[in-house]
Amino acid sequence: MCNCLYCYRPLLKGEKDMHQACIKKFFGTTTLPVLDYTMEQLDQLALQIIQDQTSLTGVQPKLSLHLNEHEGSKRLTIVGLWGGYICKPQTSQYEMMPEVEDLTMHLAEVARIEVVPHTLMRMADDSLCYLTRRIDRTSAGEKTAMEDMCQLTERQTEHKYKSSYERVGKAVLKYSSLPKMDVTNFFELLLFSWLTGNNDMHLKNFSLYEAADKIRLTPAYDLLNAVIVNPKDDEELA
């Protein structure tokens, strides 16, 4: 691939996978960290973590990663829930899901929707995974207050599809420090999701968090053109 996995622009001569500036922007390092796992290894680890009940919530396999230094090089290693990054590897059920999610996030940025930091990342077997930097953790690893709409509307996780966007909007108006701005952002995100075939925006995919001493709607995350990934699903919205 001749384009940067972070910004999609052409790489310069001698660069591999990411521009130097993009590495610095996403990881805060001068060299690209190593993700020394294969797709098969991540599948096995994800199953083990789910059995141990230390996985992040959601249907798509997600692994928590921590950036550390090992023998002089930066490496991303799988940890418990406290990791600063979330990794979504390829799946056998849905082809190229990481690429589709990253592209959908890029399209949101083009539409001037604020999104969480994200990138594609090459693994040891040359397959690509999707990485996002967590916004509910500080650079020191401390937890930031953040609650999703299941919590804010008092719904169990298994009932995340049994609600309405009207109810989410009312929760934004009730709890946000800038309610009019955030409910507008929420509406724009719904419109974008409909336009891009994202029919999986359930209650867990909207959250409020503490930012600069204010309670705000979080930047968008988990945006995926589900219709491309699963053409048999003809729903328009969650």
Residues covered by each model-derived region:
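Anionic ligand-binding catalytic core segments
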Residues: 1-203, 207-238
